């Protein structure tokens, strides 16, 4: 059977919390069997997309996200930087492309971008696309006009995570609301940009909270094209890093993490499910189970914004052991006009 015979299978946006909870409660083998079947119906079974994430503006963010060491409220000693020069960003993109990445993601530690920064952002998007790579930005909240500007520049994806379950949101962040996140996602959709939206598990939440997190994503009118699933990297000096340090909750159980990936795959079968932060501390066996559960995208390189990542050599060795191959880029090279 052609793995791409049904690239966009029928999807549902009417999942109930009870249905999602029942998936989480399945025997592990049954859950993985369902997830793998859903995965193969829409995606190549043994291909994984390689993406690279670059911090183009680090630290100094006014938001109080309890998980983030780039917040001005965190006491981590991280020094804030200005927005990177366009040329330096494009040099990093070229290095990522040469290392095998097909998507280049650029992240800025802002509550929202200022209009004065948009011309440089536009040049970054255009420059990366001319290399034949897919582009993704995560810049915080957007206005409708800013989303349209990014769309006109050719931006492929905009990342804006919902972070956690709606009912738990104010326990993690107080400087914005869950509804603020949804509003930006609506602007991105209306502008015609693909949505990258997921969140973080391992923040001391319960399984019921993880059910709520998946439910919020799987009941969006249109599912995100990419769903990053992050495992919290506890950083000393952040609210959650200090709260969870030296407790059993400091790291999510790997089997529970795999379950979360599997449920994301079943409920959002056409989406790319990306293993994101926290992968550097996962065993190879746990990562292999995540791929079995339907994950088909990872971030490569030694860094994810300001935290450590698994690294290219370890990833290449794991792919070789698993018989997994990198996915080709969908973005065509755009030649500049003469």
Curated annotation (Swiss-Prot):
CDD domains: Radical_SAM. This is Biotin synthase. Homodimer. One of its GO terms (molecular function) is 2 iron, 2 sulfur cluster binding. SUPFAM superfamilies: Radical SAM enzymes. One of its GO terms (biological process) is biotin biosynthetic process. Signal peptide: none annotated. Belongs to the radical SAM superfamily. Biotin synthase family. Its EC number is 2.8.1.6. HAMAP family: BioB. Residues 46-270 form the Radical SAM core domain. NCBIfam families: bioB. Catalyzes the conversion of dethiobiotin (DTB) to biotin by the insertion of a sulfur atom into dethiobiotin via a radical-based mechanism.
